Amino acid sequence: MKQVDRNVRSNDLSIAWPFAFTSVQLNRDTSLLKLIAMVTMLIDHAGKILFPQLPFMRVVGRLAFPLYAYCIAVGCVYTRNPLKYLSRIVLLALISQPIYAVALRHTVPSMYAYSFAEQPLRAAWAFYLGSWNHPSILVSLAAGVVLITTLKEKRISLFLGTALLCWIAQRYFDYGWHGLALMLLFYLCSNTRWLAIPVLGAYMIWWGAQGTGYSLFGLKFGIQMFAALALPLIFINTHSKMRMSQIFAYAFYPAHCAVIWALSEFLLK
């Protein structure tokens, strides 16, 4: 009996893992945030391919990634099945990659090394493999899910190993390690509003200050500075009660790439 009491007291004194969050204090209106992310991403990609003479479209597009990154962090907090959540993103990445590569003009000569008329299977395989020369943002989002989940579930060795691999392979991620770090910061700050505002604000300003091309009051900064404009949407609870179809949310990415490609073929040729 005494042994049991000692075990109970020992368990009571154990320290809970501080990164296993089960709730979010920041904006939980992720359907609205995803919609804004979709629209700004569409504007960004349309500006890059269809309207390069309108640079403000690329500025508007800077809001998309922080919103998606935040939604990934919130998804990791609330998902009951992290593996299923990750699998959906990976499957979407596998399906979308060739469409993305063609639409956003990330093609390479190896994609067209074989004739579809003469060697259709080999040509299709070469086309698909070559499209991965510049992976889409979905690969970064999938890596973010792995990093957050391994940290949340206290799999420290796996977390550190994944972080090291991501650091080594950062050239294959949109936004490099900066984007992966942002997803981690969103997760770590998601349950503490007073910490989120200064930490995320400082990080976004620091990130934007790394580039050039813009200036204000004599201070030079890059286009990524405009991504900080997404933070108020994340910090303020909007309560729109909007519900977005999961199918629509996932299908939008390859669909918008296909539309941009079709328009570029019709309008620019």
PLM features: what roles do these ranges have?
Residues 1-269:
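Alpha-helical transmembrane segments and their immediate juxtamembrane cytosolic regions
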